[in-house]
Amino acid sequence: QAHGMGQLIDLVPNHMGVLGADNAWWNDVLEKGQASAYAEYFDIDWHSATPGLAGKVLLPVLGAPYGEVLARGELSVEYEARSNRWFARYFEHRLPLAPASIFGPLRDAAAGGKPEVLAQALDGINGPAGHDALHALLDAQSWRLAHWRCAADEINYRRFFHVNQLPALRTQREEVFRATHA
């Protein structure tokens, strides 16, 4: 107040919150991987030596190891007709799926415009008999789901301390700096 200020705000412009499905840049990276216009905005190690992480972003959001979560049926696929987009769902996490990864029966069911056919196709992949197909679909993404405890050892992006939902931005790059300060 001695300096005529009513409020002082401490900004952290080199990190960005990505929790939830509201961050368009992060979701674009998840959907398109290295082909995303924003892939270089985040400080992601796309060439990780960790098995299964080359070309992928680690998403340590699971409450248990991946195999257990899959076996318990806690992962599912959703289709959003109004945007013609596909998502993987894990409780509150809604993760975009790469359009090219959507295989024949699901793609055809959505294109057919018959809700009952689409519901049947989704029941097939989301049910116990669809675990192999669901795993193959998830494995084809530019991200890899993992138990949250894996983050300390396997995370392949710089973040704010150990907060997985605050990945670092490469604000040292002029285009990123401008985009984050617009």
Where are these regions (language model features)?
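Catalytic cores of glycan-processing enzymes that make or break glycosidic bonds
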Residues: 1-182
